[in-house]
Amino acid sequence: MTHPVPIQFQSPDLEAIASSAGRIVVFAGEGGAMGVAAKRVNRLMRGALERAAASEAFGKLKQGEAMELGFPAGMAADAVQLVKLDRRCDVATARKAGGAIGRSLSKAGTLVLADTIQRAAEVSFGIALRAYDFTPHKTGEKTVPGPVTMMVANPETVAAEAGPMAALAEGIFFTRDLVNEPANVLSTFDFAARLAAMHELGLEVEILEEEDMEKLGMRALLGVGQGSEHPSKLVVMQWKGGPEDQVPLALVGKGVVFDTGGISIKPAAGMEDMTMDMGGAAVVAGVMRTLAMRKARANVVGLVGIVENMPDGNAQRPGDVVRSMKGDTIEVINTDAEGRLVLADVLWYAQERFNPRGVIDLATLTGAIIVALGHENTGVFSNDDAFCAAFLKAAQSEGEGAWRMPMGERYDEMLKSRIADMRNSTGREAGSITAAHFLRRFVKPETPWIHLDIAGTALLKGDTALAPKGATGWGVLSLDRLIRDMLEK
């Protein structure tokens, strides 16, 4: 898998700055305020840095943005990057500043002169996240950034703060790698194998095969994958880092490794992006990896239904009726509304087996949520106000966009079927809401539940402050924060 770039922390050495090759990064706040190390660079550059910080171009920069000064006189470095950042900044701005650095690391090495910036660990986290580069399928010489060193006033303290963030970066990168992989590489077999390998980190991993799910009555999930040559699987990952009597939190993910739409086949244009339809399962996997790597003091179980939705002579048809593990029957109106069928059985299994304190499911579930919220926010649905508020607070603190969507009985009535207990698709109107109501039917009344529709946030066509175009890893940060707040305090 792709690993974050390692970052070393050391005390400031002003005499070493002039001879440092590669790229030098310095910070200046509003009005051009600079620390000791930046002032040293300014002297070496004969005032050029101060003039840049006083320029109109620098004045127009927002906090966390940067400008370049190429081939600085008086220094061995190839370039100096001037980042606009106040010494006392918030977490999101510090990460954004790190992202500006991470997008342009030098092959010859990068020296970050953080001085006394209070959020230096968050800056390093932003560097790591933005430096992500998915290259396993590219041939030829690959550009590998040189060593990254951060000179900071209190290196031991910053290194200790950055430790858990390194585990988070590993989890986010694992999620991004899974979502970015093509379906001919990430089959249901390979996905399950990658998750099983995490037992080396201390996770308990169990794989349920099709015959196991058949015995449990999971015909909703199994029907989705019956047109594929690759068998469906249910992977259960348990992290038991909390007290024995702590009731676990359950995370449930949709893992459709490729979605053609089945017999209700999708248009060809854009179908290549349906390799990301396992994004919910990838986030669950990334969170579980993070918990194991940082030795979280919490009990969490992650469950992912892994299937491939393909059309062939054995594929599920529009009009079929399937029986879920719960016992409810479902009329399949549209085979391209398959994710909710997968989640229905996994949600019920999670509650029956683990009786969790709460369940959070994640899925690239509907295009309707993109129409409603674009690519800035994940749609949040819940049956429990307090649980939902805790999640929204966690998402806001981590800078991940999330917006609560409405639910109501009139939407639930739209699921009525003429021949079964419910139907899996209701048409275009309120598509993300009716999908959430479908899932809610497989949540016990006493179970706090959150549904996260990440169709608009799991993969993006353009760069962001903390990720290149492609998979974002949205959700790992928010869920890890929620687990810290709920289970580890």
Curated annotation (Swiss-Prot):
NCBIfam families: PRK00913.2-2 (NF002075), PRK00913.2-4 (NF002077). Its EC number is 3.4.11.1, 3.4.11.10. The gene is pepA. GO terms for cellular component: cytoplasm. It catalyses: Release of an N-terminal amino acid, Xaa-|-Yaa-, in which Xaa is preferably Leu, but may be other amino acids including Pro although not Arg or Lys, and Yaa may be Pro. Amino acid amides and methyl esters are also readily hydrolyzed, but rates on arylamides are exceedingly low; Release of an N-terminal amino acid, preferentially leucine, but not glutamic or aspartic acids. Presumably involved in the processing and regular turnover of intracellular proteins. Catalyzes the removal of unsubstituted N-terminal amino acids from various peptides. The keyword Transcription does not apply. Binds 2 manganese ions per subunit. This is Probable cytosol aminopeptidase. Its cofactor is Mn(2+). It is an enzyme of class 3 (hydrolase).
